């Protein structure tokens, strides 16, 4: 067990780690190259804990005991009695290596060295040490006391006992330890690439604007924040750097391709909240959203003809249209007056219209994939008559639920984003980076998704996810970005749950 913990770096991460372990009963010493930063961090933690007392979350006695356990370490040598030292300094390989070299000269040989790096190789940091076996990754998420996850990263030469001890320490502090090998992005930053890069791809293709994409993903699949809100909150410079880093570390695998538009916005200083403008504008720190378009009511004169890919979902859509008082056609083919409402899964509208030999001027797509009680999505295609688009929008918004109209896209917005998340996480499982159930819990804890990838697959159906990916890949001419993971494909083909494990490789 670890009882004396040193922390190097008194920024947001370092002070959060200090508070976490002091609250868990550990003696903590906090060091920073700037002595003023240590004082600021300890004062910040004291004020935060005092607010906890005021709200009844801890007693005055617990406050005093916790503060007593957090001590300043003005000199690095003051950490010499620690049995664990966690670095939380600048994200720079040479700086971290230099720190660990100096720490090795001051600490006992059995003291464990942990790095809080979010993107650098733990193995490369440890390579500078005389005893790389005592080095491991211990990656927390900000704010540390509230984000109940820590990635415990095995470097190539990390001692298994070091990993076990860090796991136990995390559990003592009430955090979920996700053990992961030393791979690009570790676990969470790796899995999170699907949400961010797919949203950027949708924007770059002119399918929808940033605010539309955010609204669709909040109100359909139920994400707490849209991807572009998240870019603005995190800072696009930081997010784009992570996207580029993961892409390069995986040797330009198309799954991780970042956005050239994001690079341009970074160069222009459109970074989000911290610069007052990103994908949204900010005044006094408050986001300014563009008002949603208000459509003039019109008379729906045309009947609707629905495709019949899914009988249950078709019934829900028919009931919605009947509620608007529209006429529905039930024939196998549409009449010459009917608006054809199609429901592609993974295909774009143009492909499905051509496949079904439907009249392009009268055909528009509706997304039945995600819940549509809060927001609905129509997808136009280049040949559509705008007057008929307006009638479709009127009919589907009669009950006050807003309707987004986007341009033609394989998989709309929700389908392609959710399918990309599930697919990437299946690939992570295939590579042995994490067990699917561990991955599921880690993602919901760290990223705040409404469901983990397994939850998404269970809710929407793994078979439907595979169908979306296969159709998208076909629409994009076989593009490798959308290739289905073997993990997903095999389990769907064999009717197995995505949690079904592979057997360990012998040897």
Q: What role is predicted for each listed range?
A:
Residues 30-33:
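Conserved acidic E/D residue at the C-terminus of a beta-strand in Rossmann-like folds
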Residues 37-40, 51-113, 120, 322, ...:
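Rossmann-like NAD(P)-binding element
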Residues 10-11:
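Glycine-rich Rossmann-fold phosphate-binding loop(s) that bind the pyrophosphate
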Residues 2-6:
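Beta1/beta-strand and adjacent pyrophosphate-binding region of the FAD-binding site
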Residues 21:
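Aromatic pocket-lining residues of Rossmann-like dinucleotide-binding sites
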Residues 24-26, 175-182, 210-409, 416-420, ...:
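NAD(P)-dependent Rossmann-like dehydrogenase/reductase catalytic/cofactor-binding core
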Residues 14-15:
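N-terminal Rossmann-fold NAD(P) dinucleotide-binding loop
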Residues 98-147, 154-167, 340-389:
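Rossmann-fold NAD(P)-binding glycine/threonine-rich loop
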């Amino acid at each position: 067990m670890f009882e004396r913990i040193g922390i190097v770096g008194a920024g947001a991460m370092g002070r959060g780690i200090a508070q976490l372990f002091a609250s868990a009963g550990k003696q903590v010493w906090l060091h920073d190259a700037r002595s003023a930063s240590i004082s600021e961090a300890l004062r910040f933690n004291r004020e935060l804990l005092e607010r906890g007392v005021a709200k009844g979350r801890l007693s005055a006695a617990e406050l005093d005991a916790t503060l007593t356990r957090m001590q300043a370490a003005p000199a690095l040598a003051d950490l010499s009695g620690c049995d664990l030292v966690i670095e939380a300094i600048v994200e720079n390989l040479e700086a971290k290596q230099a720190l660990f070299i100096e720490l090795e000269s001051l600490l006992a040989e059995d003291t464990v060295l942990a790095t809080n790096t979010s993107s650098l190789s733990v193995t490369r940091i440890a390579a500078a040490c005389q005893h790389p076996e005592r080095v491991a990754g211990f990656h927390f998420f900000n704010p540390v006391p509230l984000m109940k996850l820590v990635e415990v990263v095995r470097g190539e030469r990390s001692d298994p006992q070091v990993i076990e001890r860090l796991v136990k320490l995390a559990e003592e502090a009430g955090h979920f330890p996700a053990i992961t090998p030393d791979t690009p992005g570790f676990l969470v930053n790796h899995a999170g690439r699907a949400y961010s890069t797919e949203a950027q791809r949708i924007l770059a293709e002119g399918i929808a604007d940033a605010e539309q994409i955010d609204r669709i993903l909040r109100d359909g699949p139920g994400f707490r924040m849209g991807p572009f809100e998240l870019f603005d909150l995190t800072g696009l410079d930081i997010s784009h750097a992570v996207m580029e880093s993961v892409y390069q570390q995986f040797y330009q695998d198309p799954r991780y391709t970042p956005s050239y538009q994001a690079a341009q916005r970074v160069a222009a200083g459109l970074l989000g909240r911290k610069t007052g403008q990103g994908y949204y504008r900010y005044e006094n720190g408050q986001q300014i959203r563009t008002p949603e378009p208000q459509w003039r009511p019109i008379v729906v004169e045309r009947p609707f003809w629905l495709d019949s890919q899914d009988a249950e979902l078709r019934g829900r859509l028919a009931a919605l249209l009947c509620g608007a008082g529209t006429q529905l056609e039930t024939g196998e083919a549409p009449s010459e007056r009917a608006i054809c409402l199609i429901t592609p899964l993974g295909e774009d509208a143009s492909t499905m219209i051509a496949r079904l030999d439907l009249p392009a001027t009268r055909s528009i797509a509706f997304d039945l994939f995600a819940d549509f009680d809060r927001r609905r999505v129509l997808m136009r295609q280049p040949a559509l008559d705008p007057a008929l688009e307006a009638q479709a929008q009127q009919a589907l918004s009669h009950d006050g639920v807003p309707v987004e109209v986007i341009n033609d896209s394989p998989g709309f917005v929700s389908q392609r984003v959710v399918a990309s998340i599930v697919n990437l996480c299946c690939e992570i499982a295939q590579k042995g980076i994490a067990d699917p159930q561990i991955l599921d819990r880690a993602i919901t804890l760290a990223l705040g998704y409404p469901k983990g990838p397994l939850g998404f697959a269970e809710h929407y159906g793994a078979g439907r996810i595979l169908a979306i990916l296969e159709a998208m890949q076909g629409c994009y001419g076989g593009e490798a970005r959308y290739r289905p993971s073997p993990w997903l494909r095999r389990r769907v083909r064999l009717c197995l749950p995505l949690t079904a494990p592979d057997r360990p490789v012998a040897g």
